[in-house]
Amino acid sequence: MALDNINLNFSSDKQIEKCEKLSSIDNIDSLVLKKKRKVEIPEYSLIASNYFTIDKHFEHKHDKGEIYSGIKNAFELRNERATYSDIPESMAIKENILIPDQDIKAREKINIGDMRGIFSYNKSGNADKNFERSHTSSVNPDNLLESDNRNGQIGLKNHSLSIDKNIADIISLLNGSVAKSFELPVMNKNTADITPSMSLQEKSIVENDKNVFQKNSEMTYHFKQWGAGHSVSISVESGSFVLKPSDQFVGNKLDLILKQDAEGNYRFDSSQHNKGNKNNSTGYNEQSEEEC
């Protein structure tokens, strides 16, 4: 998704001016402010909707006197801290990272849904001053989006987060080591702004090595390394993910990791072990439990 879909009110000019007066690394502080960010995003279905992190990158160089900031919602694969999240309408996170005498880079990784976050700073030329600290978010992860395949609508519902973890196993197994992440638009999950049900729009997103198409509550993934015309459609039915291959070529790949049902589709749920990838899947689950 394009960054212009998100409007982030990071700081005021007065706050930046105040930060620039800091003289040493010891004065850097992480402030929680009553500052809201507005998320403007299109509608889309449940698939992977609760499975992303927020990465914020900040860089300050005194000779330019500017802050460079960016934010992205990324569906991250097994090797990249895959976590689920719940994005609120507003975030109360603010970083003062300006150092007038030397360059400094900072990276803030907030896994909102699992109540954890990392602030990591790096002051060039002085390794002893590098430090890392944790931050606890007050976001409630219980209000998640649910997809209804029967009428192509979505709404709010409280349910277990465990099923949302499993989609990363599927994508990482299908995708191998080609791309570590891809971006998806994220729906505003503020309950006050969500009607009981909304129609989903068909949308095409191109990111790195994949094309992602979504229609109603089903999403179709086209992996470039498979070649043109090969894809897999993923939907949610009865508490499990249903994967429909476009042809026998894709079906053969799914045979390596999932079992086929009577209708020729492949199902994936938390009770099913991946064929031929048991060790990798187990390693990922342990990592997820550790981080969540």
UniProtKB/Swiss-Prot annotation:
The keyword Nuclease does not apply. Transmembrane segments: none annotated. One of its GO terms (cellular component) is cell outer membrane. Disulfide bonds join C19-C292. Keywords: Cell outer membrane, Disulfide bond, Membrane, Plasmid, Secreted, Virulence. It comes from the Bacteria. Residues 273-286 have a biased composition (Polar residues). It is found in: Secreted; Cell outer membrane. Pfam families: SPAN. It is a peripheral membrane protein. Residues 129-151, 267-292 are annotated as: Disordered. Belongs to the SpaN family. Required for surface presentation of invasion plasmid antigens. Could play a role in preserving the translocation competence of the ipa antigens. Required for invasion and for secretion of IpaB and IpaD proteins. This is Surface presentation of antigens protein SpaN. The lineage of its organism: Bacteria, Pseudomonadati, Pseudomonadota, Gammaproteobacteria, Enterobacterales. The gene is spaN.
